[in-house]
Structure formats: C-alpha cells, structure tokens
Regions:
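Asp-based phosphoryl-transfer active-site loop
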Residues: 1-2
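C-terminal active-site rim and adjoining tail of enzyme catalytic domains
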Residues: 154, 161-236
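Metal-dependent phosphodiesterase/phospholipase catalytic core, i.e.
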Residues: 6, 11-159, 173-174, 179-182, ...
Length: 236
C-alpha cells in the first residue's frame, strides 16, 4: 500500500537495490525505502523486471529473462485487465502481505483490507477472488468486512532462510493461541475459522492432513513445488 493509500502489486515492503532502478536507469542504493512511505507517483518512477548482475539473485536465477523498464503496477491496473470479457475465466489468488515482525511497513489490517475490498468491488471481482495471507489477522478482518470472499490460510511450520514459520504454539500470527497438539491437525483449525483454502508449504504436507482437509471441504493449495520429484509426491 502506498503512502496515498493505493494498493500495489509487489512482493516486498521495501524497494530492493538488487532489483530496482531509479528514473535515470541506475540501480538504487538505499535499502530503507518503504512503499508505505512513498506516494504512487513516486513509486512509479522506479523500474523493475531485471536483476543486478553479480548479486545473490543473479547467481540463483541465472536463466531468468529480464523484462526491462517494467513499473510496479497498481492493483487496479491488474483488475482492469482481468475484468475484460476475454479474461472472465480468470480466477484470482490474491495474497495480502502483512507482518508482525516489522513496524510501520504497511497500514493496519483493517485499513489494508478495506482499501483492497474497495478495488475488488469496483471491478466486480468478488466472486472471482480468493484472498490469502500469512498473517491471519488479515483473514479475520476480511471475514468481518466481507464474509462472502473466499479466505485462504497460509501456513509454514518450519523456518526457512528468508521466512520464519507462522505456525507454532501460541503464535501471534494465528491470532488465537493454540496448543501444540492442535497444530498437528491444521485443517481442523482452518475449518473452525470457516476458511475455504489451506495454503501449505510443500515440505509440511502430509497425506493425513490432505485427507483431513478434503474431508472438511477445504481446497489444498501447496507452495511452491518446482522439482519433479516433489510434484510427483504431491500428486500421490
């Protein structure tokens, strides 16, 4: 969300010097620039779509094809596209980025949800949208403001190099406090919260919990499965 309350499509809370160029085409150097502290007009002066050479990103994604000169889009830019008749079969999985570990990088959940719902309603996409979040406060707020939009609960039960788990005993990410024994059966928790989708990290998937999710009528969305052997395991 920009300083002037415009939802954008961007993965991070800050502009990344390894991925972002300024209006002159130079790689930025300031690591502290938060989107929430920039107006959308200011954000639109930066370009993305390529990776700075010799960085960890460049080494990790050697085959990535750059799309130079791309701008950070407004959420409504995308909504305009999918609202066209030729894209009426497109269904949206919209993740709202919110965090408990960093201060002042987004508005509060109530405001974020309100701003995004306004755009969804404007383009009549309520029946074509699933909203997911790692921060379950967002999903609680969504249910309050519009219970008709599908809600997907993102879960991570192990720490990753770039992301810490959100499922653990008495986790604040989950809003309510759950004892350890209940966390082994996450679909039960999501069902009790009237969720629609369980969005689970692929290494946390078990056959027992997938079967339990299906029993509860929950769709299971697994992230992120790139290797063939993992794809086969997920299918099985």
């Amino acid at each position: 969300i920009s300083k002037d309350n415009i939802p954008t499509i961007f993965h991070d809370y800050r502009l990344n010097p390894d991925l972002v160029k300024d209006a002159s085409g130079n790689w930025i150097t300031d690591k502290s620039m938060k989107l929430v502290e920039l107006t959308y007009e200011e954000i639109s002066k930066y370009t993305i779509g390529s990776v700075k050479p010799e960085t960890k990103y460049a080494k990790r994604f050697k085959n990535q094809k750059p799309i130079k000169g791309e701008k950070i889009p407004k959420l409504t830019d995308f909504f305009k596209l999918v609202a066209e008749d030729k894209h009426k079969d497109v269904f949206l999985n919209l993740e709202i980025k919110s965090t408990l570990t960093q201060e002042n990088v987004t508005p509060n959940p109530e405001k974020m949800v309100s701003l995004i719902l306004k755009d969804i309603k404007e383009y009549d996409l309520e029946n074509r949208t699933l909203i997911t979040s790692y921060d379950w406060r967002i999903l609680y707020e969504l249910k309050k403001q519009n219970p008709n939009i599908l809600r997907g609960f993102i879960t991570l039960q192990q720490d990753l190099p770039t992301t810490k788990k959100n499922v653990y005993e008495n986790s604040p990410w989950m809003v309510k406090k759950y004892p350890m024994e209940e966390l082994f059966l996450l679909p039960n928790i999501i069902k009790s919260l009237e969720g629609h989708v369980w969005s689970v990290f692929y290494r946390d998937v078990t056959k027992q919990n997938v079967e339990l999710a299906h029993k509860h009528g929950l769709a299971t969305c697994v992230w992120t499965v790139n290797r063939e052997k993992d794809i086969i395991r997920m299918i099985e």
